[in-house]
Structure formats: structure tokens, C-alpha cells
């Protein structure tokens, strides 16, 4: 199990098939679930840029509309225990980064599952 004190490192930025539009699908999901403006999100193949943009959105939501942030986490089905673990951590400065990593990881898993379902492999 990955410690929440370390940043998730994506060996392949789009582990489920970059050639199949994972970056575009990720941006679309983030836009829908977190009201990110598509035009302001970095290029779809720039995971570091997308992550940085998402970190800023997490900071904004947590400080201005915490209930909406929690609602968004619930809507994308992020594990409540993982959210609690991040919020209880001693290192408060990395909370937005850890949430961004968790959101990206969950969104990529959702995309993979949807694609498997559509192709009849699930």
C-alpha cells in the first residue's frame, strides 16, 4: 500500500493506453466533475500540467466551498477512508497534492472501467 506521505508517480502517465485518448477523457471527466474550464487545462498529454491545475482547483474548493469539494469526491467515488486518511495526516502542506493524485488515479480507473464495459470485456 502506498504511503500518503509520498507523491504518486505515474510511470506511464496514462497507464491504460495513451493512444486511446486517455488524456482527453481525463480532461473531460475533470471538467465535468470539478468544473475545470477545458481551455485552461494544460494539453491532454501533459499529466504534470493537468495535476498542477487540479491541485490549484483542490486548494480553491477546499478553502472556498469545502462542502462542494467533499461532494465532488463522493460523486467520483473516491474511497471515504482514503479521504479521511489524507485529512488526518500530519503533513498538512501536501494535502492538495495528495488529493489531486487520488482524483487522477480514480478518474483514470473510471475511464478504464467504462471502456472495458463498452467493449463487452467487463
Regions found by a protein language model. Name each.
Residues 1-46:
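Charged, compositionally biased N-terminal leader segments and the immediate start
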Residues 33-37, 57, 61, 76, ...:
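Conserved, well-folded catalytic cores of nucleic-acid-processing
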Residues 62-101:
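Amphipathic protein-protein interaction modules
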